[in-house]
Structure formats: C-alpha cells, structure tokens
C-alpha cells in the first residue's frame, strides 16, 4: 500500500511496489483519457529551490493531465526561503494547502527533512548530488518497456558520476535486479562516490571503472549518458577542462550493438551529438515522455486514489 508514503530515495519502494507503479503507468499510456479527471480536487505543490525545466514541468503536466491543480515556486527567491524560513516550517504550511508535494533542493537530505515534518506525501525531485528517485522510476520504466526486462543487463554510465544524482539513483535501483553489471566511464575527477562502490561490493554486483568510452561501448545493453554539471563546480577552470570529456558521436556509436539503447536524463549540453538523435538507439526523448506517465502513476498511488 503506497497511500500516504513519501518517495525520498530510490530504495524506498520494494520491487513489487515499483511493479505496481509501472503497471499503472502502462495503463495510463494506453488509456490516458480514462484518467483525465481522477485527481480533480487535488493540489500538487512544486517546491523548487533549484532551477529545473523538465522535472518541474513533468510533475506539473502530470497533475494537470490527471485533472488536478498545481501551485508552488520555481526558485527560492520567490519563496519565504529568501526570508530565512526553514524547510520544516515551509512544509508544515504547505501541508495545510496541498495534497502532495514535489521538492527539489540543492542541499542533500532536504526532502528527507521535509518528509519528517509533512502531513502530506513528499516526493524528492532531486537533492543536490544525492538522489533523483522519480528520474530513476522513469529510467526503469523506459528500460522495461524497450528491453522487456530489468535484469541480465550490462549498463554503462558515462560522464559525471561524482555529482550526477540520476546516476547514483539508477545504480542503486538496478543493482537490486538479478545479474546486472555496470561499466562506469568517467575521468578520474568525476568517479563514482566510494559509498556506492561499497554498496555494489556488499551485494556482489559486478562493476568496472574505465576512462575509455570507445572500448567499452561494444558490450553494453544500455548507455546512460550524463552531462558534466557546471553548477556543482566551484572552479570554472575545472569545469571547462572536463566538460568535453565524453561526446557520443556517430563514430563511437557505430561500435555499439544494434539493440543497445542510449538514455540521458537531460538537459543535454554537448555530450551527445545532435546527429545521434536520428539513430534508432536514441531513446532519451521517449524517456522524457515516460517520465510524465510514471509521475502520474506515482501521484495516484501516493494519494491513494487507486
């Protein structure tokens, strides 16, 4: 039963509960009009302390398509946070107005704090470089829809593996399924955090670290590309030096299997050449559409409507 629950971490839900969400997502995809009034009278609060286009609009369009309404803010300067109000007090007040909340915050753990003080379900829409669980649900639904399975896959994660919260959530989630392995492709400065490697080791999940995309791409079922995130760098010189570390182009993808799929949480900067968009293995825009449907299903479940 997911009614009244929070989603803060990709591991908050069991595999069985995730399957419930994926099943409902597919029902919405196939019969969307039947769900167009299911959230009438419900209000989503979008509390975005950090800039976002895709995630915020995905949440908002999800609720609007379900017949509900949306309120919130898209930057801290337009909220009482600019006056020094705490997250705890903000969510207490929001709980008086809304039925469910989606929060993005630059500080790791902020949505967890909000959940502790909230009387309504809180969804983590990204906290610093930590977690992005609804993107993970999006990624899993995309993989399941295209590959037909979430196990026995070789997953390549490429780019910013240090600050990339989408990658952290994806690795944690996919490591729960049988016989998945990871190829972690990044420059030395942007390697995956040690705590994630310890988790993989504790589960006996196979992984390898490399700096070479060309030699790794041939054996992958999934290539998950990420951008180097300018907003996580304190030194502009370091960002400029690392931002072009990996660019997926025709030459590199020509070495990949015909049934490999390329995913990206977006926004893209230049890590995927535009010429790849027409390649049948490019699924990142379809992935974005799946994100709206999975958020529709998630909110229905957390609100206990179905």
Swiss-Prot record:
Keywords: Pyrimidine biosynthesis, Transferase. Pathway: Pyrimidine metabolism; UMP biosynthesis via de novo pathway; (S)-dihydroorotate from bicarbonate: step 2/3. InterPro entries: Asp/Orn_carbamoyltranf_P-bd, Asp/Orn_carbamoylTrfase, Asp/Orn_carbamoylTrfase_sf, Asp_carbamoyltransf, Asp_carbamoyltransf_Asp/Orn-bd. L-aspartate binds at residues 83, 165, 227. It comes from the Bacteria. Carbamoyl phosphate binds at residues 54-55, 104, 132, 135, 266-267. Its EC number is 2.1.3.2. It catalyses: carbamoyl phosphate + L-aspartate = N-carbamoyl-L-aspartate + phosphate + H(+). GO terms for biological process: 'de novo' pyrimidine nucleobase biosynthetic process; 'de novo' UMP biosynthetic process; amino acid metabolic process. It holds the Pfam family OTCace. GO terms for molecular function: amino acid binding; aspartate carbamoyltransferase activity. The keyword Metal-binding does not apply. Catalyzes the condensation of carbamoyl phosphate and aspartate to form carbamoyl aspartate and inorganic phosphate, the committed step in the de novo pyrimidine nucleotide biosynthesis pathway. Belongs to the aspartate/ornithine carbamoyltransferase superfamily. ATCase family. Heterododecamer (2C3:3R2) of six catalytic PyrB chains organized as two trimers (C3), and six regulatory PyrI chains organized as three dimers (R2). This is Aspartate carbamoyltransferase catalytic subunit. The gene is pyrB.
